[in-house]
Amino acid sequence: MYKLIKKCGRARRGEFVTPNGTVKLPGFMNVATCGAIKGGVSAIDLKALKCQVQLCNTYHLHLRPGDKVVNSMGGIRKFTGWDGPVLTDSGGFQVFSLAKLRKINEEGVEFSSHIDGHKIFMGPEQSMQIQSNLASTIAMAFDECIKNPAEYSYTKQSCDRTFRWLKRCKAEMNRLNSLDTTINKKQMLFGINQGSTYKDIRIDHMKQIRELDLDGYAIGGLAVGEPAEEMYRVIEEVEPFMPEDKPRYLMGVGTPVNIIEAVARGVDLFDCVMPSRNARHGHIFTWQGSMNILNAKYELDSKPLDEECDCPTCKNHSRAYIRHLFKSGEILGMRLAVMHNLYFYNTLLERIRQALDDDTFDKFYAKYSTILGNRI
């Protein structure tokens, strides 16, 4: 259940109550693709990093270790040791981006595993069954992730099929949630808005999926190479047609500036691999902008990564030490950097919420939508 607390323009301060805990919004989901944050960060660590929600990947967990294995271990939360909410994506994005030799029809998609090439079929029912086995808090509907930009006629055809798939997802989830053998009988379902960058298709598709009265709604198919301004335009066009009483999730976004801009346009929830992926290569997010800790100028720098940060990394280690760890190939350097970046992202959303609570979001936006894009 979503509760809207207050608004500042289009920006929304709210809460989303789930069977596994309440999520303060706007919020960021920490990406644990295969049930773990890449970079050696555990579920225990996440507690100290202000993580609210963990996002796991249906496609990858289905292939390894297998959703039935996870189910036999009590579901994804028990399996990973994370007791908060977990969102699983449907596997659609990976099917259309990683898998080989795809064949799509009304029933679903046949594809070859990117690991060993064996044939797999996934459709709405299969995606819901896998996510039910994983016992996540929130399941994402199975959709077609088309290229951006895509031809207008194919985009329309794809969105119509995705809507039919969504209705099948809802019916299958209702069935699964009624079974005695289901671990999480209160699993929630989010639908995904698609439509490439076409305003009319995006709006028509949003009008369709909102009629199904789902637990939440996502904007998909963005942050895949289009200019940021085009992404913002699509959000602005779709947002007025999204239900006020449901959370809005922008999938796969993004940079700190992207997040601030999207919050200003009415988005509540985000996920992105950027904080962990960038950290593994020495790219650090700070309140002054981003930095590359591998640069020679940090060799004798005794300051923490960010003097405004009180994460475990910044409270205990210097830039010089972390640079040394990276240069020496020590895994600890990657781990400390990932912990810092995740803490930064979670704190960014915390500060956004505080600014909305204090009616100072306009000032926050004016300051940080510029500063956080800097390279230092």
PLM feature segments, named:
Residues 1-183, 296-299:
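Non-catalytic, usually N-terminal nucleic-acid engagement modules in DNA/RNA processing proteins
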Residues 1-17, 23-32, 37-40, 143-149, ...:
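C-terminal extensions of enzymes
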Residues 21, 54, 89, 131, ...:
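Conserved, mostly hydrophobic/aromatic
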Residues 21, 162-169, 209, 238, ...:
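Hydrophobic alpha-helical packing residues
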Residues 126, 130, 157, 161-168, ...:
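A non-catalytic, amphipathic alpha-helix used as a structural packing/dimerization or gating element
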Residues 148-151, 156, 216-222, 331-334:
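Glycine- and acidic
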Residues 160-163, 172, 176, 184-305:
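Glycine-rich phosphate/ribose-binding loops and adjacent secondary-structure elements
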Residues 172-182, 246, 352-364:
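Surface-exposed helix-capping loop/turn segments at secondary-structure junctions
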